[in-house]
Amino acid sequence: MQDLWEIGEAKMTTKIKRQVFYSFHFDNDVMRVQQIRNMGVIDGDEPVSPNEWEKLKKQDSGVKKWIDSNMSYKSCVVVLIGKETAKRPWVLYEIGKAWADGRGLVGIYVHNLKHPTTGACTAGSNPFDNVVVQSGSDKGKKLSSLVSCYNPKTSDAYNDIKANIGDWIEAAIASRK
């Protein structure tokens, strides 16, 4: 009987891989984002290829449609914050959409992940400072007062993210319930 309890206990504590949507500045941070995808801790959307992105960018409606389609069925949006992420209009759209849709939303600074050719970069601004809640009891508040951003250890950003990203995502999802 004890063996069954232990098996049941193990099943109860098994973590599931969440389906997430990554939001980031493609040109500057795609290599850093790829490091996070390769950790294998969570299941994320596949990035659009540079050629496909160039086609999509020709019309705002094409980009919006791609974002809306790829964000559907995701439980959380993970904003990977680099030097210029907070200035990117499509990142701000993704943040606003995630909040309006009731998805988990979390920010992780990635400036200390090493890019193969350029190394680390400087930290960017918090993109949640640039998005204001449009309705509900939090109307008028900046999302930076409602959404957690994590700044991994400078000395070992990769392993800090790998060890904690699952918990950060779970906390973001729980905060929206």
For the regions a protein language model found, what residue spans apply to each?
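Conserved N-terminal substructure of TIR/SEFIR domains
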Residues: 1-76, 163-177
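Conserved nucleotide-binding/hydrolysis micro-motifs of P-loop NTPases
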Residues: 27-29, 112-115
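A short acidic (Asp/Glu
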Residues: 33-34, 89-92, 117-119
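Structural signal for conserved beta-strand scaffold positions within catalytic alpha/beta enzyme cores
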Residues: 47-49, 107, 148
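Short C-terminal domain-edge/linker segments immediately following a structured domain
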Residues: 51-56, 78, 107-113, 136-142
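Conserved beta-strand-loop-alpha-helix hinge of the TIR/SEFIR fold
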Residues: 71-99, 103-114
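Glycine-rich, charge-decorated loop segments at or immediately adjacent to ligand/cofactor-binding or catalytic sites
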Residues: 113-134
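A conserved mid-domain beta-alpha-beta active-site/ligand-binding segment of alpha/beta enzyme cores
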Residues: 128-177
